[in-house]
């Protein structure tokens, strides 16, 4: 079992990565688990993993909230349902919230934990590749609003993250590849050596080779942990983790959080951002080609959907990086390096989006 520490002073926690961790969940934790627990999950996940988790939680007072499956249900309505369960059960501020599922479940559960009784303990058990390498680490919690993704939320760190790689065996091919997009992102923005490793091991990752997958997850978590430790509240460095997300979130919102997975939208967003960087002479053409080739090698989208420019603009204007009405873009400037840029003309952005969609 591998361990990655997220260093945040008294709020530090450990990410545990390995096989067969779920059946012995309580024994894996270095601290005593809360007596009152709400497990938030969804039907897709619960049919495989809820029973072994509940067996491990024997002796605790456990309630379960099975939210409906899908990004569109990461909503205030689902949040209210979870709150009703906690209040009706008489749970107090010593309770804990366990997220058993992917990014949607984790984001909602974290927001519930951050606000119930002004904050209760929160535990992450991510079951998708995307959530294991990204959303479960770093403390971002949120629900969506009809006008944009993640507009209502808080920074709230978990007490621990337990990544059981065996959970990936039940992922669909599409959801598995969605997680690969976030892994590619880390190489592009932060670690050229890791990017090269991904190029060299694309075949193994496509085949879900356990050794390659374990390393890719561990290195991704290490990178995110380093970034979060330096910039928890996204005042500078952490913003680079949003590579591809300004365009990606616009794709998701415009297609009503259903037609594209988050990872697919991010992959298309990475291409748009990389092309924008190339066109504005920040990224050389060779590096752009490497980024595109790696996404292609992992069977990820390299073109976004066609939609009116005004739709792109409307959704991008709701991005959290907008300041004083000015769009800010995370652009790769070399493999392993990126920067936040605001000095890009709308005409240039329009032309690049047209070319990439």
From Swiss-Prot:
Cellular localization per UniProt: Cytoplasm
Protein family (similarity comment): Belongs to the sugar phosphate cyclases superfamily. Dehydroquinate synthase family.
SUPFAM superfamilies registered for this protein in UniProt: Dehydroquinate synthase-like (SSF56796)
Reactions listed under catalytic activity: 7-phospho-2-dehydro-3-deoxy-D-arabino-heptonate = 3-dehydroquinate + phosphate
Binding site for Zn(2+): 182, 245, 262
NCBIfam families: aroB
Gene: aroB
Entry binding sites for NAD(+): 69-74, 103-107, 127-128, 140, 149, 167-170
Its EC number(s): 4.2.3.4
Highest taxon in the source lineage: Bacteria
Keyword terms, alphabetized: Amino-acid biosynthesis, Aromatic amino acid biosynthesis, Cobalt, Cytoplasm, Lyase, Metal-binding, NAD, Nucleotide-binding, Zinc
Physiological role: Catalyzes the conversion of 3-deoxy-D-arabino-heptulosonate 7-phosphate (DAHP) to dehydroquinate (DHQ).
GO molecular function, one term: 3-dehydroquinate synthase activity
Binding note for cofactor: Binds 1 divalent metal cation per subunit. Can use either Co(2+) or Zn(2+).
Signal peptide (from-to): none
Pathway(s) it belongs to: Metabolic intermediate biosynthesis; chorismate biosynthesis; chorismate from D-erythrose 4-phosphate and phosphoenolpyruvate: step 2/7
Keyword Heme: no
Cofactor(s), names only, from the UniProt record: Co(2+); Zn(2+); NAD(+)
Record's protein name: 3-dehydroquinate synthase
GO cellular component: cytoplasm
GO biological process, alphabetically ordered: amino acid biosynthetic process; aromatic amino acid family biosynthetic process; chorismate biosynthetic process
């Amino acid at each position: 079992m591998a361990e990655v520490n997220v260093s945040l002073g008294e709020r530090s926690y450990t990410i545990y990565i390995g096989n067969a961790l779920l059946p012995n969940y309580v024994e894996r934790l270095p601290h005593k688990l809360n007596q009152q627990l709400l497990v938030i999950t969804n039907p897709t996940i619960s049919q495989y993993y809820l029973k072994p988790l509940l067996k491990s939680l024997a002796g605790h007072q456990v309630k379960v909230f099975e939210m409906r499956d899908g990004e569109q249900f990461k909503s205030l309505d689902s949040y209210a349902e979870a709150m009703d369960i906690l209040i009706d059960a008489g749970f107090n501020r010593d309770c804990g919230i366990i997220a058993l599922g992917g990014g949607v479940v984790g984001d909602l559960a974290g927001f519930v934990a951050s606000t119930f009784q002004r904050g209760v303990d929160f535990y992450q058990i991510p079951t998708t590749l995307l959530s294991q390498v990204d959303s479960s680490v770093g403390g971002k919690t949120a629900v969506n609003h009809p006008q944009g993704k993640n507009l209502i939320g808080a920074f709230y760190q978990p007490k621990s993250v337990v990544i059981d790689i065996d959970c990936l065996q039940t992922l669909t091919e599409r959801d598995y590849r969605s997680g690969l997009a976030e892994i590619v992102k880390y190489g592009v923005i932060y670690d050229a050596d890791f990017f090269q490793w991904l190029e060299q091991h694309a075949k193994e990752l496509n085949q879900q080779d356990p050794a390659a997958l374990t390393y890719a997850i561990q290195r991704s978590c290490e990178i995110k942990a380093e970034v979060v430790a330096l910039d928890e509240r996204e005042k500078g460095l952490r913003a680079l983790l949003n590579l591809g997300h300004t365009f990606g979130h616009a794709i998701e919102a415009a297609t009503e959080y259903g037609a594209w997975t988050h990872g697919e939208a991010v992959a298309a967003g990475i291409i748009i951002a990389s092309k924008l960087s190339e066109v504005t002479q920040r990224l050389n053409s060779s590096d752009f080609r490497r980024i595109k080739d790696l996404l292609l090698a992992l069977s990820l989208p390299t073109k976004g959907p066609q939609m009116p420019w005004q739709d792109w603009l409307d959704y991008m204007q709701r991005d959290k990086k907008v300041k004083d009405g000015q769009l800010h873009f995370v652009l790769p400037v070399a493999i392993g390096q990126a920067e936040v840029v605001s000095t890009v003309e709308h005409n240039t952005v329009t032309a690049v989006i047209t070319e990439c969609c």
